[in-house]
Amino acid sequence: MGNVRVIDVHQSVYAVNDEIAAKTRARLKEEKTFMVNLMSSPGAGKTTTLIRTANMLGDRYRIGVMEADIDSSVDAEKMAAAGVTSIQVHTGGECAMDAHMTMQALDEFDTEGLDLLVMENVGNLVCPAETDTGASRNVVILSYPEGCLLYTSPSPRDRQKSRMPSSA
């Protein structure tokens, strides 16, 4: 019977992506640009939410949008029609942006003049959630077709009560 030899390299398959994401965060921090990775299923309201947000906050903050899509430019055209500074990133069949694509897009976008940059990721909830893009925050919009997600964090008082022995 043959021997099995295991070689454990202890390196994440995301190691290169994570390194680029860290560089992206450092670059944006230096430029004083806060980047949000906005995710949802198709039709959940990402574009509409971004246009309304830009209209509400545009007088106080310089806002830009990075539109990610497999092949379409529809959302970037909507942003432009609404007067929102944006660029279109075609992911070439990839189901979500990764750190390398984000960095390439940033090289084409004048982020130094922005306070807030929102990446409208590809309409998909499977791929983008686990991929680090270099964004400061990840935000998910859930709509009724996905069902209702309710997360409540217990208050400190409730947590304290749960540590008390039961009287039964």
Residue spans of the language-model regions?
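Nucleotide-state-sensitive switch-loop elements of NTP-binding domains
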Residues: 4, 10-19, 33, 53-129
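Conserved beta-strand segments of the P-loop GTPase G domain that flank and frequently precede/overlap
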Residues: 38, 89-90, 140-144, 163
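Short glycine-rich anion-binding loops that position phosphate/pyrophosphate groups of nucleotides
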Residues: 41, 122-125, 144-147
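Conserved Switch II/interswitch segment of TRAFAC-class P-loop GTPases
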Residues: 135-150
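Conserved small/polar residues in nucleotide/adenosyl-binding loops
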Residues: 151-158
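Hydrophobic alpha-helical segments, chiefly the membrane-spanning helices
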Residues: 164-168
